[in-house]
């Protein structure tokens, strides 16, 4: 089917009731609070997990062995390592760990040592390492970063700060969690934003996008994927300069995201230094607008457009 399988593991949490925890003496790898207790987190599975210390030799060995097994024994396209570039460092007062007590740069260094070693040991040129979110200190460690925790409150207006700074040296996918239902305009808006900010598209459960009531969304996603392939040379290695709005198209209500123009735009500069304007009409209606050059164009419903257009940087 042409699908690339990248299994999930967690780079930070460990189930204390798991067999591996007992086998590897996982308690020795955990972050220890000042009072001697462990950090505990509970997610959707409702199973308590403890936070592992990235400087622990035990945790580094466990992560390395799991990545090696997945990448070689299963021959997958890579490994997705959750939470590493997402969660903030925890203080650790375990005197047996190879770091100063409390906080410090040892946290990031532990992860860097861990995954640099794992890559050299287990990941070939046709495989990737991916993680959640986009902490700066890990950009060079991962081939793909999943952007997923963007605030969805309607009174907020997220800005593409990370892509503006790092779009020419990082690859990322996603925009935010995709709420239900997806056929109320929110998925098309998220897809448009993702494309314009440089994200790889398609981060959604397959069952939701192939559902009978999501045919327009599936069509839009397919068109945007085809368009992204067309402008890949701009987005990969290029630099996002900022967003652009025509200012003459109607605003649309997006559940969970507030009001936004029916046509969204972004200014990019390719690796060759050429300026481009990308536009996406995520509405079911066509819209006329004026380009920065003064030229008038009409964008068809659920379509995208690109051209070499001088755009003043702001």
In which residue ranges do the predicted regions lie?
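Active-site-adjacent "subsite" loops/lids of carbohydrate-active enzymes
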Residues: 3-74, 158-162
């Amino acid at each position: 089917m042409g699908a690339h399988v990248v299994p999930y593991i967690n780079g930070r949490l460990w189930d204390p009731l798991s067999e591996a925890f007992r086998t590897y003496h996982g308690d020795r790898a955990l972050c220890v609070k000042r009072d001697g207790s462990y950090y505990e987190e509970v997610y959707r599975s409702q199973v308590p997990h403890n936070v592992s210390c990235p400087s622990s030799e035990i945790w580094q060995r466990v992560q390395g062995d799991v990545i090696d097994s997945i990448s070689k024994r299963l021959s997958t396209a890579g490994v997705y390592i959750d939470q590493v570039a997402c969660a903030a460092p925890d203080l650790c007062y375990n005197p047996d760990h190879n770091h100063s007590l409390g906080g410090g740069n040892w946290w990031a260094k532990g992860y860097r040592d861990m995954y640099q070693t794992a890559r050299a040991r287990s990941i070939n040129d046709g495989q990737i390492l991916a993680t959640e979110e986009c902490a700066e200190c890990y950009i060079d460690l991962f081939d793909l970063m999943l952007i997923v925790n963007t605030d969805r409150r309607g009174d907020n207006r997220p800005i593409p700060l990370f892509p503006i700074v790092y779009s020419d040296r990082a690859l990322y996918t996603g925009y935010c969690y995709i709420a239900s239902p997806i056929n109320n305009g929110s998925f098309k808006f998220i897809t448009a934003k993702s494309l314009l900010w440089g994200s790889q598209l398609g981060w959604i459960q397959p069952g939701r996008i192939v559902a009978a009531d999501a045919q327009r969304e599936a069509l839009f996603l397919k068109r945007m994927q085809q368009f992204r392939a067309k402008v890949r040379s701009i987005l990969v290695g290029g630099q996002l300069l900022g967003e652009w709005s025509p200012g003459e198209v109607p605003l649309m209500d997006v559940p969970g995201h507030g009001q936004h123009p029916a046509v969204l735009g972004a200014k990019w500069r390719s690796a060759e230094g050429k300026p481009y304007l990308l536009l996406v009409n995520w509405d079911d209606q066509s819209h006329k607008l004026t380009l920065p050059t003064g030229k008038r164009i009409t964008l068809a419903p659920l379509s995208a457009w690109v051209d070499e257009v001088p755009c003043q940087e702001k």
